[in-house]
Each structure stands twice: as C-alpha cells, then as structure tokens.
Amino acid sequence: MSDFAFFALEALIKCIIIIAIFASLAGLATYAERKVLAYFQRRIGPDMVGPFGLIQLVADMIKLFTKEDIIPSNSQKFIFAIAPLISAICAFVSLAAIPMLPEFTLFGKVIQPIVADINVALLFVIGTSGLCFYAVFLGGLASNNKWSILGAARGLVAIISYESVGALALIAIVMLVGSFSLVDINNYQSDGFFSWLIFKQPLAFVLFIIALFIETNRTPLCLTENDAEIVAGYGTEYSGLRWGMFFIGEYASMIAGAILVTLLFLGGFNSFWIIPGWIMMIVKSSFIFFWYFWARAAFPQLRPDQVMKMCYLILIPLAVLNLLITALAVLL
C-alpha cells in the first residue's frame, strides 16, 4: 500500500471512529448527568430500565428519534432545517485537530490519534467550535418565534463577549509555548507535574473555564435558554431528530472542551509516574467534564446583566492584565 493510500485510509478510519465514539459518549453523558444531578438532589435517577438504569438511554433515544418532526409554517424552513445539522457538524469537525492519546505503532506504521496535526490547531478548534453558536443563532432566528429569537440574540451577545475572554487567555498560553499546535503545547508539559501550565497560568485557566461554560451553553452562564424567562430559547420550536442534533452537538462540544482544557493546562496525555498517558488523559478529561454537572447542580442561573457585567468589568480586564504579565515574563 502506498503512503498516500495509507494516509487516506487512516484519515477516513479516524473520522469514522471519532464520530462513532463521540456520538455515543454524547448520549452516555446524558445518563451520567442525570445520575450526578440525582445524587446532588438526594434522588436515585434512572434505575428501572436495565442494570443501573443504563438502558434508559436507549429508550430515550427511541422516543426522541421517533417523535414527529414539526416545522412551523411561518418559519424560514430551509434554515430551520439545516441549523441543527450545522451545530453537530461544527462540534465534530473541531475534534479533528485535537490529539486524543499518545502515538502508537500499528503494522509498522506510527499512528497519531489525531485526524489533522496542523500547526494552527488551536485557532482551528476555537474557530470551528465557535461556529456552533452560529447554528444556534440561525435556528432561533429562522423559528420566527419571539422566545427563540430572544434566546438566539442573548446567546450571540454572550459568545461575542466571552470569546474575547477565552482568546486572551489562550494567547497567554501561546506566548509561553511559542506555538499554536496542540501537540507542541502537550509536549511543553512533558517534564512532570509542575510543568503543567495550570501552575504557570492559573488565571488563564480560570478565565478559559468560564468562557467554556458560555460556549457550551451550561448553567450558570447559559443565556440561550431559561424556563422562567424565555422557555427553551432557540430550541422552543424544535422537536424530534432536529432537537436531538442540537443536543448531540452541545454534548460533543462539552467533551471537546474538557479534552482541550486537559491538553492546555493539565499536562495532556503525558504519562504521570507509572500511569500511562492515555489513562491520565481519560481521568483528567472526565474530571473536567464532571464540572459541568457540578456547576449545574450547585449554582443558580445568573441574569443576563450579571453575566455581561462580569465579562466587561471583571474578566476582560483580568485577561488583559494576565496577558501583560505573561508578556513581561517572556521578555525577561
């Protein structure tokens, strides 16, 4: 087999594996979230269908995907129909440039668990994942429903504001490492526990986590939907499979965000003592992913004015200050 044919086959297999695994994980995450929230609220959660309620996930999927697909008569039908697909596609495309595990050898060929190892991977991931909000805005606007439009507009304002916070935090990382490649950033943290960037950039870590909650539509910083204010927000008119596509895209973005935090701040997939790198990657990413559930259970929903004031009066000034301090540290 020629090198090009092997490369093409390898890339195709990687794409199929990523879609299959992360679509499954997105569904499994719903079960995990229900169990975690039940524990916080002193409930049991799903426990009737299958062992530990695991088959409840299958029952919910059957129910969701067999529901009638309703398109409102006064909506922009084409945009309304494709917006959920854009959301899911952008979430999965962003995973293409994220290295998941250490490289390994298969049939004499070195395999890197990444579809595209590009030198601007960080820019690619942030750009493609940010497009998920473009789908949210299109879906809300095309619904021609006041709650959907309000949710879409609130989400758009939030993502424009908090992208600045996340970008400034990441620029500090790039200044230290000297590269936009996620593989290079991972390798920068290969000298042991105290080489992790969370110790060199603790403020950037906090700022990026906050921006991540906005980008993934998670409580307490979710502005696109609120039962007490705008019903289901951008998703008010969606049902069945189309609502499920938004749902899969959101959870895939959450998983990608957890992996990205691990790569940027927590040592990535480097080995720790006698623990292999791939185990460390799974453990650390799962720990970050758990934060989504913990925050939803522990914190109240913030008002839009509180979210925006926090961004412009606190977070952006802190991000700029962190950037200036990092620049001085690099120069000196």
Swiss-Prot record:
Its main location: membrane. PROSITE patterns: COMPLEX1_ND1_1. GO terms for biological process: aerobic respiration. It catalyses: a quinone + NADH + 5 H(+)(in) = a quinol + NAD(+) + 4 H(+)(out). The keyword NAD applies. NDH-1 is composed of 14 different subunits. Subunits NuoA, H, J, K, L, M, N constitute the membrane sector of the complex. This is NADH-quinone oxidoreductase subunit H. It comes from Campylobacter jejuni (strain RM1221).
